[in-house]
């Protein structure tokens, strides 16, 4: 079996991949993650997932390289990582009582064959009505400034949800394991 490499520095993705109990290593790809003019969010996450995986092929022959990227979409607007309290407050205020769709791009690149499987897995979060005090308490408690949509679904962020909708809850955290297992099996990897 080719070695498995996660093209990410995300601790969330690393923790998710570890659930599969397969040996893997991690390496952070160096790519330009800028959105192209008029690029649809669906296309953006698939392109970035593929580029992250392909960026590591030169140094990693005979590897299956996993790339992933995620954006949150609210009212057809892409929400990036807030990086600050103020921006997170704006995002969660705008999302209050609405639905936020997370698009997670996933790529599995076989550096031996040059073949790449790419997909996008959507997951929708229906948010509760949130007042400013609730949002501020949440932000001070969890500081989700490195998360698209300004919350951590694997933590206290779940308290902001009214309901969720999607085929793979792990896609919300950044690595859709159900779809990844399909891709790995197609490459001949035994899971479990």
UniProtKB/Swiss-Prot annotation:
Pfam families to which the protein is assigned, alphabetical: Maf
EC number(s) on file: 3.6.1.-
Cofactor(s) needed: a divalent metal cation
Gene Ontology molecular-function annotations: nucleoside triphosphate diphosphatase activity
CDD domains: Maf
Catalytic activity: N(7)-methyl-GTP + H2O = N(7)-methyl-GMP + diphosphate + H(+)
Enzyme class name: hydrolase
List of catalytic residues: 69
BP GO annotations: nucleotide metabolic process
Keywords: Cytoplasm, Hydrolase, Nucleotide metabolism
Residues flagged as site, Important for substrate specificity: 12, 70, 154
Ranges annotated as spanning the membrane: none
Alphabetical list of HAMAP family matching this protein: Maf
Function: Nucleoside triphosphate pyrophosphatase that hydrolyzes 7-methyl-GTP (m(7)GTP). May have a dual role in cell division arrest and in preventing the incorporation of modified nucleotides into cellular nucleic acids.
Family: Belongs to the Maf family. YceF subfamily.
Protein name: 7-methyl-GTP pyrophosphatase
